[in-house]
Amino acid sequence: MLHHCVLHIICALFFFLPLGGADSNYAISKLGTASKSQKSLIVNFSKSRNILLLDATGTLLLSQDDGTSWQDAVSNSDPAVVEQLYQHPFEDDIVYAITKESDILVSEDAGLTWFTVTMPPKTVIEAQPFEFNARQSQSVILNAARCESGSIWTGVTCYPFTYYTYDNFRNLDSVHDSIVSCTFAVGTVEFAGQDEDQMLCLIRENDVDLQAPFNQQLISVSKGFESIDYVVFDPYYGSLGTESVVAVGQYLVAAVVDVNSKKLKLHYSTDGQIWVPITFINAPSIGSLTVTRSTSLTLGVDVESTNLKNPVGEFYTISPSDAYAVRRLNDTNRDTRGYVDVIELDYLNNTILANTVANTEDLYKRASRQKELVTKISHDGGFSWTQLERPVDLECEGDDAEDCHLHLHLGITETKFGSLSPDRLPGVIMALGSVGTHLQPLSDSDLFISEDAGRSWYLSLQGPHYYSSSAYGSVFVAVKANENSKLIYYSLDFGREWESLEVEASFRALEIIPPKSLDSLTFLIRAKVKKEESFIAIDFSSILSRECTFDEKKVANGDFELWYPFVMDDTPQCLMGRIEYYLRKKRAVSCVVRNEVPVHSFVEQICTCESKDYECSTYFEPSDHFTCEVNPESLDPLCRVDPDATLQLKPYRILLGNSCVPKKKEEKEKSISMKCPKLDHRKDIHMYHHKIQDTISNIVYMEGTGEPDSTTELLLTSSQKVLFSYDFGEEWLEFDEKKNPSFYGIYPHAFLKDTAFLLTKDRKIYFTNNKGRSFYRLDAPSPPNVVGYPVFNFHSLHPNWVMYMGSENCDDSFYEDCRSVVYLSFDSGASWQKLPDELEYCSWVLGERLLVEDKLLFCNRRRAAADSIGYDLVASTDFFETEASSIRENVLGFLLADEYVVIAALTDDETSLSMHVSVNGRNFSPCIFPQNIQVHSQQAYTILSSKTRALFIHVTLSSRKGAEWGSVLKSNSNGTYFVNVLDKVNRNELGYVDFEKVEGLESIALANVVLNSDEAFNGEEKRLGTLITFNDGIDWERLYLIDAKKHYPHCDSKCSLHFHGFTERSVFSDPTSSSAATGIIFGIGSYSYYLEPYETSQTFISRDGGVHWELIFDSPHQWAFVDSGSLLVAVPSTNKTNILYYSEDEGRSWIAYQFAEDTYLIEDLSTAPSGNSQRILVLAKGKKSSETISFTVDFSHLRSRVCVFDFNDQRDFASWTPAGRDGKPMCLFGHKTAFYRRKPGRDCFIGNTPYVSDTIISNCQCTRMDYECNYNYERIAGGTCRLVSGAEPPLQQEEQCAAEGAIEWMEPTAYKRIPLTTCEGGLVLDESTTHPCPGKEDDYHKIHPGTPVWLIIMLVLLSVFLSTIVGAWVYTKAQSYLVGAIRLGEDPADETVFAKLMTRIESVVTAVPIFFSAAYHLVRSVFVRQDRSMSLDDYDNFEGMEDAAFLEVDDIETSE
């Protein structure tokens, strides 16, 4: 039905107006007032004169007469509100309307009839949801979403959901919910793939701990999802990181964000089966790119070359013949959305228009400056470019006369004004532009037209206009832009001359929509008429009544001509190796084309190749002498595989898409032979510097998931400002510059690497869970505590559970009623609840492997007595809603350390410290130290390590200032019994100890001992010496320096290598080793009698876990592990420098790199804690005392590819097994282990390469190294264990019977097996007599059935008989040896044969009483029943959170 005026649609009016001798019809339809965010949408059709209109109110209208009259498109009493309208790109009679309720209306007859597809509830359909099949119009994919309403905190959560249909939505199937989106492989008419039903889908790998797109893979799907195949871009990552897939011309292009480098990479396919990576030679770091429309043979890609707010790009073309991207044009114009001013013209082969930025240097200085755009054109697919010639009748004035050209508005701005290529009119170009040195704004532009593919131009209309044309250029239409007018212009001769017609109402044009059907000559002009959006329909059929004639055999006789794109002196010329022509309507004739006429090119002649038909090949570049010379850098990917290779290369190649035939014996067709050049890769290192007007207090790296260099860096300055960087310090931005808050600190989440809390002085918390890309501003419940407790405590199982240690009444200077308070949040700080006031400090007990209630809290509770020392340790599992459970009184502190909960407490008389341990969070047992070690109240514990199923603690035995040292003790597996493993170990007055485990090697540690403890106690300066252990503290030895005599010829055998340890490190987080570079250890020290001062020290390295050491620098250096140790970086630490050194061969050789012009004193060499980044921060002291210079050194371009790990082909990695100084593989914890490291010299970076970090080759036979001394035993010279004087052997019945499933216990020996050893067989030192555990007697006797009495009697008789025989034989032999014997005292070297014999026999005879003892116990076990005893509760194992802590009675400690 027709709408009436009350519905804001007026009845269509027709006027027949004779204007300028021309006749035309027009009609105006008003559509009401549109909002700023909405506009009407028009869809017209190629096979009918129907038009669909979606107006701003969501009403869908249909016209069947070219827009003259309108009616409801969908016949419904309650028409749906339509929000989106889409037309099928390959069958334009099919249209889809998306309603506000996300239902789909489908029409297959140009809008005449519709059917409704009702979508499931909660479906959301956003923009561009459809994917179409170019060969099967009924096959459609719908990429939608399902949305769920969440809490106020989470909001609405939407998940991708994809549907597909093979009958145009009559039947609809959904895919698996892990599918992100799908597309058809046959997405373009040009695509040549054979499988018409193939779909390509992005699938989310839910078991991969990465964020999108790194958890997305590309899969190939057959019809109906009957089969699914994963696309493989990388042998290990598959297609992880796939961002999107698009169909462009004959190509499928997949954009992949590399998991390692975080750079964007492209892969293409021409059949949907085989994918080829595109290689960009000497391209900028790819962070954003745009795939442009391809030619028939090539693919265009524009890569963003800057990260400016006003971006600039580089244009490349790719050929399937070699998959190399060749740079064709620099400084292309881009916008922040990714749109690019590079356009290939329709209906014209190899012709490209592009806008370039002429003032790029100015943009670097100030990104907000206006770009100066210069238009260029290429007629050979981008190989050569020229500027546009201005119309001959237009000139520039003054200084601009020499550089006066025509410049055009192209893709970024021009598309809304009109199309560059008129419909089916080869060689004609229309565009708005200006004449001058660069492009002027649209308001100062005119309409220009070229009829010869851009070689010459003429001014068509002055001022900016909207413009369009009908098919084949029968009529051009234009209206003025940006001003009100009543005139509509039209031209029948390609815009040379224009006529005008006038309408009654003044309008302001917004768009011209040309007719799509050859049966129509009606143009629609979308315009504002009296502030109402309207459409003006103009029908030119009355002035173009004659139909054009076309005879394919006699073209010249009709209304078409043969048009040649390149003509000189009226003679067609070779272009791209051929003479070709197009069929084009003659300009001078007035007629309308009603039937299709071919618009493709026709080849008339193939030409012989000339110089212009060649370009430099991939590895060559043009020289100033018009020849192609090799580019050594481009050969790098080839030569790094084999640096000594001889290459066969062709310097020239025929242009892509060129058809010429080479001449015989053409020199440009010949190959040359050349050796790989030697390259200096230092120029592949990128450096950025930034001046920070402050000193640095702390740097936090938020690594998150994915590629190593995708970190966000948060920096806290000494003036309490926070800076952040998204590019590893290339640029530092100040946090919340306008409000300028002061920060207490930065607190990274302990279990979520992309989450952190920033606490301000005004009690605000800035919370991020996306690596600082955005922040939530929250309220802190109170100021932070003032006594040094961790402000935030995080839950390992529930990341949103956060504990806050705050304070009350601590604002005044007297702190009279100042106290600590504890708050809990279950929503990452959005809300807080306060725990009871008497709680001083709390911690979650749940560790990584501790199987306790996740609500379990341990807290220090203040004691009632004001003068009391320590706290009451209490526990709660309901956040103190009920009475807390008391654990122990007089507690000084507690600590979670891997598998242990450790309590330090005062004894009841407050005279000494006691330590208690639990491995289940419930039951605590006292720690029993060796009898000769007592810990008094003035002494202290330092928890050192707990990684190897044993607690290492340092017990202070001397706390005199300047003479602090103590003993390192090691516990059994449940932390209760301790043995002394090293005496006189150095510590400082803060409690830190010179004891450090080697990362990645579980049994190796370094320690410094005080060599002159007595003298140091009496006031002399401590002299330190360094020792190393390879078996977890059992044995210690000196360090071995390679070529020590060569470097230190005057140092005798008393000299050894000593290192400055943990206590002297300025930045405690700086590691001497890294688990990412297993076996590589750095040290600063001296080869001397004892450790020399730091300033005179040297730098050493070990590549084999500390077995051998090598001198690398003659002065102290700082170091960093880059890319998992495949790159080592060092910089002098005591002198000013502008040089850093890097090594690609594990420190065997070093390359100097100058990172600055001036010299600086380096304060820190910093990189991400994981050690697998390829960037480092060099932090230097500035010229001013309160100034820091940050240098970012980027090594990511130093290598050309990612390392590949393959067990069967270890070309990039080599296995390394720790070995002793004799070269034999070392058994660490009872097994030989192979670690994999990148081979020195391999041209690859590790990044996140999924390689096996370590592999157990085989278990070893047990040796003495697999045993440690039992409690109350000490190791003596020779490695044996003896009972400490005055001590008793440990009673282990309770401990052994407490183990899960224990049936028996064994009497102690002097040895016990190391908990982590996996050795098998060999030496057994920890077995002795067994007894049944209480209550397990029946089970015990099933395992050890009683020995028959007759066997016992036989064993006794046999022992007596053997003893008699052996004794008689010894006596006889001794008599013969004694004849003529002479005794020479006690010298063992002169021991007599008899003595030697007796030594051997003694071992035999001694076995007799042992044998009898065994027999006795067998007898006893038959008749005697063991006494019953109490058993301990079983212990569960868990891992805690921290690796070291210092517990001390600060209030009562005094100096001795």
UniProtKB/Swiss-Prot annotation:
Membrane topology (UniProt): Single-pass type I membrane protein
Keywords annotated in UniProt: Glycoprotein, Golgi apparatus, Membrane, Protein transport, Receptor, Repeat, Signal, Transmembrane, Transmembrane helix, Transport
Coiled-coil residue spans: none
Topological domains, Lumenal: 23-1348
Intervals holding BNR repeats: 62-71, 106-114, 448-458, 489-499, 823-834, 1100-1110, 1141-1150
Protein name, per record: Vacuolar protein sorting/targeting protein 10
Positions of transmembrane segments: 1349-1369
Function: Functions as a sorting receptor in the Golgi compartment required for the intracellular sorting and delivery of soluble vacuolar proteins, like carboxypeptidase Y (CPY) and proteinase A. Executes multiple rounds of sorting by cycling between the late Golgi and a prevacuolar endosome-like compartment.
Glycan-modified residues: 44, 330, 349, 974, 1135
GO biological process: Golgi to endosome transport; Golgi to vacuole transport; protein targeting to vacuole
Location of the protein in the cell: Golgi apparatus, trans-Golgi network membrane; Prevacuolar compartment membrane
Family note: Belongs to the VPS10-related sortilin family.
An annotated GO cellular component: cytosol
Primary localisation category: Golgi
Signal peptide: 1-22
InterPro entries, sorted: Sortilin_C, Sortilin_N, VPS10, VPS10-sortilin, WD40/YVTN_repeat-like_dom_sf
Ranges in the topological domain labelled Cytoplasmic: 1370-1456
